UniProtKB/Swiss-Prot annotation:
Name listed for the protein in its UniProt record: PRELI domain-containing protein 2
Domain PRELI/MSF1 span(s) in chain numbering: 1-175
Transmembrane segments: none
Highest taxon above the source species: Eukaryota
Pfam families linked: PRELI
GO cellular component: mitochondrial intermembrane space
InterPro entries associated with the record: PRELI/MSF1_dom (IPR006797), Slowmo/Ups (IPR037365)
Protein's gene: prelid2
Amino acid sequence: MGIAVEARKVYPYPFQHVVTSYLNKYPTPLEKHVLSVKTVEEKTDPATGVVYRKRIATCNNVIPSFLRRCSILKVSNVYLEEESWLDMKTRVMTLETHCLTWAQYATMKEESVYKECTENSNWTEFTQKGTITITGAGFLNRVLETFAQTFLSHGVKKSISIMETILRERCGCPFS
């Protein structure tokens, strides 16, 4: 069946500040479940100037312990792969993230875009769509999807809150 979560937020900060804050957001004491983020590839297209990055995030497994009785869920860490394309000329950063840990049982994808806001060039618009489809877990498919939907919805709100806090700390009061 699958679930989807969408979010939109306008940060009242310039694109460069938001992108820099995003790329340096983790690890942070504001989110104890993200243990590390490591850049494994980075290159700039000489023709377009677009910066491509591939990063791997190591996160705590937050699946409730009663569900971890299932052997496939008994892992301490979950690994996410994020690919991003930063185009400073058009002031757009596009990201695609997916889960590496349970790829044979679930498809978890997030597509995010940060771009200069059309209403105010000192602001940055963020949009995100996340989907999760669980397969191969038998009767647990729907239970895990329900947990995932709750977790993703909460995670998006928390991530936005963390960005707002980091932007205030690093950049001061927002632009109007």
